[in-house]
């Protein structure tokens, strides 16, 4: 009898185990993902993503349905899609402010393979140590300089500084000393001035009212440990206005043209001046190489084009890197099933780690990828893109993130640009510029609510 009971018990256990495995098998079949959806932000690369989708399905069997929002309609399109059965599994935000709008749909990506391979973790959108947005491309800007002209300066017998190479220029004081001495020696160097013209024509002033202005805003928010997803970004005190003025004055006073004439100058004018070696330096981003190399009569060789951080005279100058960032962050829909979330994470990791995917990223999408999965021969050949990557890989250097995504409005930026032109022309004093920046930031932030 005992033997029979033992056999019966073992039989029941076996039947239970078989039932359990069968149940799990059905669950696995139910959870098997055949497709995911991606809402693409960039219409100009929609066709490339169609190719990528086809390749990925060929290699993995998973279909990536790529939908693309029309220009300037991404937020509206995302909002409409999220309320339907066609909600994207993969979407994007533009930074901390975008995360604040979509945090209920952003999955934790801290343990994702793509985030683990992010070269600089500070570039991600993070909250309380967890990553919710992973940048899929980066761009950067700083002071572009012509190494050949700088070498010519360092070799001058009559130069007034002791500096011998750009490797020694690690703070604003050093930069100022070299720039002002170069301006005095412009005839010997064969230039019209050190810096290209500070383009302050309306519509061409974004390098100053946005890109340069990013520095004091970043410095203030960092100093005060501001939560970038909070309402604390609705006001600023412009605490680092003096530092902004330091570098802006250096640009104005050591230029190829008089400050009073800058109201008609464009970005194209500045890049042409640099390309034709009328100057040694210009502030701009890695996208500028195509402008420089495309200028008729360009004299600047690819091997001579380098980057220097925009030093402004803060205590952190010597550890400051380039301004590197993006307005493009991958997010995985936390409302999708776990299997769908995993499939989305697998897709973006494949795109940035497989040979096929990396070829698309570098050569067809044209991205500078911020991940350590790329070998040297898989990285962009553009000299400024290479400089961005070189600065990112420097030990002890802190990249300046793009906090200008938090600027309250285009009106704020336009007003700031107009005030900078008035300052350059001598019709507005700096204190008035400071007050306008503080007041406009508050009023435009309030109007946006």
Go through each PLM region and give its residues:
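A local structural motif
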Residues: 34, 58-68, 86, 158-166, ...
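Short helix-initiation/N-cap motifs at beta->coil->alpha
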Residues: 68-77, 170-174, 261-276
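C-terminal capping/gating helix-and-loop segments adjacent to ligand/active sites or protein-protein/ligand interfaces
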Residues: 324, 366-373, 386-442
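Extracytoplasmic/periplasmic substrate-recognition and gating elements
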Residues: 59, 63, 84, 256, ...
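Hinge/lid segment of periplasmic solute-binding proteins
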Residues: 94-151, 304-310, 381
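Conserved N-terminal structural module of periplasmic/extracytoplasmic solute-binding proteins
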Residues: 6-10, 22-98, 111-116, 120, ...
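Extracytoplasmic/periplasmic solute-binding protein
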Residues: 132-136, 141, 173-232
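Glycine-centered hinge/linker elements that transmit conformational signals in sensory
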Residues: 177-180, 223-264
């Amino acid at each position: 009898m005992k033997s029979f009971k033992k056999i019966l018990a073992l039989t029941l256990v076996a039947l239970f185990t078989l039932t359990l495995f069968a149940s799990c098998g059905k669950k696995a079949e139910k959870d098997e993902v055949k497709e995911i959806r991606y809402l693409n932000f960039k219409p100009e690369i929609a066709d490339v993503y169609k190719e990528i989708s086809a390749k990925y399905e060929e290699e993995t069997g998973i279909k990536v349905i790529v939908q693309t929002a029309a220009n300037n309609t991404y937020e509206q399109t995302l909002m409409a899609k999220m309320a339907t059965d066609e909600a994207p599994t993969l979407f994007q935000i533009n930074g901390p402010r975008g995360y604040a709008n979509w945090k209920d749909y952003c999955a934790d990506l801290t343990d994702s393979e793509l985030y683990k391979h992010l070269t600089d973790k500070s570039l991600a959108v993070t909250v309380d140590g967890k990553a919710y947005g992973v940048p899929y491309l980066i761009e950067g800007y700083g002071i572009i300089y012509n190494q050949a002209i700088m070498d010519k300066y360092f070799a001058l017998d009559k130069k007034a500084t002791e500096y011998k190479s750009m490797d020694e220029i690690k703070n604003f004081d050093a930069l100022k000393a070299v720039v002002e001495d170069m301006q005095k020696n412009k005839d010997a160097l064969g230039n019209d001035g050190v810096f290209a013209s500070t383009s302050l024509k309306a519509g061409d002033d974004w390098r100053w009212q946005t890109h340069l202005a990013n520095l004091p805003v970043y410095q203030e928010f960092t100093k005060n440990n501001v939560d970038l997803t909070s309402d604390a970004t609705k006001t600023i005190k412009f605490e680092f206005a003096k530092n902004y003025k330091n570098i802006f004055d250096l640009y104005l006073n050591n230029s190829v043209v008089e400050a009073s004439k800058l109201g008609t100058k464009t970005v194209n004018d500045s890049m042409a001046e640099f390309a034709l070696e009328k100057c040694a330096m210009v502030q701009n981003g890695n996208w500028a190489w195509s402008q420089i190399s495309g200028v008729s009569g360009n004299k600047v060789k690819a091997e001579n084009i380098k980057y220097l951080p925009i030093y402004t005279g803060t205590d952190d100058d010597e550890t400051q890197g380039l301004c590197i960032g993006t307005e493009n962050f991958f997010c995985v829909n936390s409302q999708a099933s776990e299997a769908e979330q995993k499939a989305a994470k697998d897709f973006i990791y494949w795109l940035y780690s497989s040979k096929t995917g990396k070829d698309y990223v570098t050569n067809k999408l044209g991205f500078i990828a911020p991940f350590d999965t790329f070998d040297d021969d898989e990285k962009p050949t553009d000299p400024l893109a290479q400089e961005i990557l070189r600065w990112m890989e420097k030990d002890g250097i802190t990249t300046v993130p793009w906090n200008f995504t938090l600027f309250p409005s285009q009106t704020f930026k336009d007003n700031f640009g107009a005030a900078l032109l008035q300052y350059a022309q001598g019709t507005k004093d700096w204190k008035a510029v400071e007050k306008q920046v503080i007041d406009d930031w508050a009023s435009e932030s309030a109007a946006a609510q």
